A protein has these predicted regions:
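Small-residue-enriched transmembrane helix-hairpin modules in multi-pass membrane proteins
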Residues: 33-51, 56, 62-65, 69-71
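Glycine-rich, mobile lid/loop segments that gate access to catalytic sites or pores
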Residues: 1-40
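Flexible, glycine/charged-enriched surface loops at secondary-structure junctions
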Residues: 14-25, 57-69, 168-173
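Internal helix-turn-beta structural module
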Residues: 107, 115-173
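Conserved phosphate/anionic-ligand binding catalytic regions in large, soluble enzymes, centered on
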Residues: 41-45, 53-56, 91-106, 147-164
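A translation/RNA-centric and nucleic-acid-associated enzymatic feature enriched
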Residues: 58-135
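Solvent-exposed alpha-helices and their adjacent loops that cap or buttress functional pockets
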Residues: 17-21, 53-54, 81, 88-89, ...
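Glycine-rich, charged/polar anion/phosphate-binding loops
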Residues: 7-16, 35, 45-48, 66, ...
Length: 173
């Protein structure tokens, strides 16, 4: 969604309804040296995902074209090298090949679920009483945790990249 006015209206409508929404945030990292990462267990993807999935509410992550690449063909998805500097015409791999940075911008998207604590009555099960019962959660509620989660996910990616650089013995972060 690019229209900030529409976005604000949607958030306000959710707030008035006492409901929440999930969201997808895109994170980018520029200037990551080609070769940063490891080809197997400590790939950029696995290291970043390990930290990002530790953020409450995260339900998914995709790098580059992500799930759209799964519906594509290699002839359309391959990032063809255009010059001797390794520049590619596209960035479907999100700046990562085989777990290593390829010199392109690293691009990933993180999906957050809607916050479950909403300002509407919900049905739950009372295990003590042995029957369904209404649940009301008083207090302040985030309408969209992705708004706060974006900052946490960006920090997690930065930590993951710094960790990979430092473990490789290259302190030029």
């Amino acid at each position: 969604m690019t229209d900030s006015g529409s976005f604000e209206r949607i958030l306000n409508d959710l707030r008035l309804a006492g409901d929440t929404a999930g969201g997808v945030v895109e994170i980018r990292a520029q200037g990551v040296a080609a070769g940063t990462g490891e080809p197997f267990f400590d790939s950029i993807e696995s290291t970043a995902a390990h930290l990002i999935f530790s953020i409450p509410g995260v339900k998914g992550i995709e790098f580059g074209a992500g799930f759209a690449a799964a519906r594509s063909r290699g002839s359309h998805n391959n990032d063809l090298i255009a010059d001797r500097h390794g520049t590619t015409a596209t960035n479907n791999d999100g700046g990562i090949n085989g777990g290593l940075a390829n010199g392109n911008e690293i691009v990933l998207r993180v999906g957050f679920k809607p916050a479950p604590s909403i300002a509407q009555p919900q049905e739950t099960f009372d295990f003590t009483a042995g029957h369904p019962t209404p649940l009301v959660i008083p207090g302040r509620h985030d309408v969209c945790i992705a708004l706060r989660g974006a900052v946490a996910a960006e920090a997690a990616l930065a930590i993951a990249l710094a960790d990979l650089v430092l473990r490789a013995g290259n302190a030029a972060v």
